[in-house]
UniProtKB/Swiss-Prot annotation:
It comes from the Bacteria. GO terms for biological process: ribosomal small subunit assembly; translation. Pfam families: DUF150_C (PF17384), RimP_N (PF02576). SUPFAM superfamilies: YhbC-like, C-terminal domain, YhbC-like, N-terminal domain. Required for maturation of 30S ribosomal subunits. Disulfide bonds: none annotated. Signal peptide: none annotated. Keywords: Cytoplasm, Ribosome biogenesis. This is Ribosome maturation factor RimP. HAMAP family: RimP. Belongs to the RimP family. The keyword Nucleotide-binding does not apply. GO terms for cellular component: cytosol.
Length: 155
């Protein structure tokens, strides 16, 4: 995480804690000519528009006082959606028995992408059951080799 995003997280985390919401992720990215600061929040049962608006208002007030971001940007606060990213240890633990999409930095047993059920996670290794054509295969993926992981929708 960049120093600027760490400073933004230091501003946002107390606000989400106060509102009893989980801070899922913070992303600062450019789309076309515009910059966006995207804050993703959640709670059991999901968040509603009023909670997103409350976080947006409070974050906006705090950022106006001492904004670590020098350029102009749009602030967006939303739910992470059905395919929420898995980043923190707790995210992986909560995803056990759920359908996930995982990519790795380098091939593991000839693969860089897996989509299947996360069978277990012990803090260092993800165990995923995938379907390859008609057979089920269990794959072990070291956590330190994971580039991205998210919940996925199974069709």
């Amino acid at each position: 995480m960049s120093k600027v995003l760490e400073q933004v997280e230091a501003i946002v985390a107390p606000i989400t804690d106060e509102l009893q919401l989980e801070l899922v992720d913070i992303v600062f990215e450019k789309e076309g000519p515009n910059w966006f600061l995207r804050i993703f929040i959640d709670k059991d049962g999901g968040v509603d528009i009023d909670e997103c608006a409350a976080v947006s208002e409070k974050v906006s007030e705090k950022m106006d006082e001492n904004d670590p971001i020098t350029q102009n940007y749009f602030l967006e606060v939303s739910s992470p959606g059905a395919e929420r990213p898995l980043k923190k240890e707790q995210d992986f633990e909560n995803a056990v028995s759920k359908y996930v999409h995982v990519t790795s930095y380098e091939p593991i047993d000839g693969r860089k992408m897996w989509e299947g059920t996360l069978v277990s996670y012990d803090g260092t290794t993800l165990v995923i059951t995938i379907t390859d054509k008609t057979r089920k295969i269990t794959c072990e993926i070291p956590k330190d080799k994971v580039a991205k992981a998210r919940l996925a929708i199974q069709f």
